[in-house]
């Protein structure tokens, strides 16, 4: 039996993702929004982490992703980068470009993408939209930033689409999604998210592209899958999209744990002796002296804030 420790797993790059597609190895991707979650998913063995603008709904409590700002994406991306470094450092980090950060002009898009890399620690950025963003993608890629595309249901266009509904169900719309996929590959995207499209369409798109496809609500035929971490953990029992499988009931576990804590505090059972500090050399001040000292304090001295 060898005494040598196992070799560290290689960092997942855009080239490794392409190799995984070519070899048939599925890509496992999840979202993360802070350092703690990033460390946990890294240790669990994910191939890629997405700092999604879904944080607007999953973390900030908004009803859509639209209010999320570029500054917030930079902030959360930097946290996730630090968390991944505390894990095994293997996962590929992609950060969403927020609504309004790339739609107005290619110049603004390049500047926003560079911020996400330089300040947020991202290795790549993801943006939503089809062939109409081809020039924006080309400009970002020429600036040295890899781009992951995103077509199908694009949450930043929720009002245009009339809600969060499956896309590409009729022949004409399916053909448009296929045309968009080819255009994004030609523009330089290294991977493509397919969201909420029929499984049959996702299979065709995946077979016709050289770049990896990563599905969410797009069936089993994509080269990889991505889920919102909060959804797969079951953090919100009231919100479970049809395409989500809950791999845990963490929300219920959190409620049980906090409920137990509240109960023990109310019952004066916590903290007990095992969770308290002791010292035999502490010099106690008599109550009388403490009261006299308090009377001598200036009337506006109310103590240090907590």
From Swiss-Prot:
GO BP of this protein: pantothenate biosynthetic process
Q: What class of enzyme is it?
A: transferase
**Might you report a single GO cellular component term?**
cytoplasm
Question: Which reactions fall under this protein's catalytic activity?
Answer: 3-methyl-2-oxobutanoate + (6R)-5,10-methylene-5,6,7,8-tetrahydrofolate + H2O = 2-dehydropantoate + (6S)-5,6,7,8-tetrahydrofolate
Q: Which cofactor does it need?
A: Mg(2+)
Q: In which pathway does it act?
A: Cofactor biosynthesis; (R)-pantothenate biosynthesis; (R)-pantoate from 3-methyl-2-oxobutanoate: step 1/2
Record's cofactor remark:
Binds 1 Mg(2+) ion per subunit.
- What EC number(s) is this enzyme filed under? 2.1.2.11
The protein's GO terms of the molecular function aspect are: 3-methyl-2-oxobutanoate hydroxymethyltransferase activity; magnesium ion binding
The main place the protein resides is cytoplasm
How does this polypeptide assemble, per the annotation? Homodecamer; pentamer of dimers.
Per the record, the similarity remark reads: Belongs to the PanB family.
Any idea what this protein is called? 3-methyl-2-oxobutanoate hydroxymethyltransferase
Q: Which organism is it from?
A: Anaeromyxobacter dehalogenans (strain 2CP-1 / ATCC BAA-258)
The protein's gene is named panB
């Amino acid at each position: 039996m060898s005494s040598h420790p196992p070799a560290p797993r290689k960092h997942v790059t855009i080239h490794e993702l392409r190799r995984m597609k070519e070899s048939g190895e599925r890509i496992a991707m999840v979202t993360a929004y802070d350092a703690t979650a990033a460390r946990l998913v890294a240790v669990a063995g994910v191939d890629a982490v997405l700092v999604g603008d879904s944080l607007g709904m999953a973390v900030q409590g908004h009803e859509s992703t639209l209010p999320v700002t570029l500054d917030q994406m930079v902030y959360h991306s930097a946290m996730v980068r630090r968390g991944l470094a505390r894990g095994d450092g293997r996962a590929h980090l992609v950060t969403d470009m927020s609504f309004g950060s790339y739609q107005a002009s290619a110049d603004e898009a390049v500047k926003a993408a560079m911020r996400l890399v330089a300040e947020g620690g991202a290795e790549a950025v993801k943006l939503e939209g089809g062939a109409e963003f081809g020039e924006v993608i080309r400009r970002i890629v020429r600036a040295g930033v890899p781009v992951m595309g995103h077509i199908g249901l694009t949450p930043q266009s929720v009002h245009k689409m009339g809600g969060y509904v499956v896309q590409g169900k009729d022949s004409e719309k399916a053909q448009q999604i296929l045309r968009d996929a080819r255009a994004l590959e030609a523009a330089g995207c290294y991977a493509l998210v397919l969201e909420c499209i029929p499984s049959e369409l996702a299979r065709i798109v995946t077979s016709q592209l050289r770049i990896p496809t990563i599905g969410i609500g797009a069936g089993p035929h994509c080269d990889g899958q991505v889920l919102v971490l909060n959804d797969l953990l079951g953090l919100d029992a009231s919100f479970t999209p049809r395409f989500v499988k809950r791999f845990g009931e963490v929300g219920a576990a959190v409620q049980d744990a906090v409920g137990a804590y509240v109960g023990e505090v109310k019952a004066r059972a916590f903290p007990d002796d095992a969770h308290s500090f002791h010292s035999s050399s502490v010099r106690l001040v008599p109550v009388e002296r403490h009261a006299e000292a308090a009377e001598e304090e200036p009337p506006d001295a109310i103590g240090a804030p907590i």
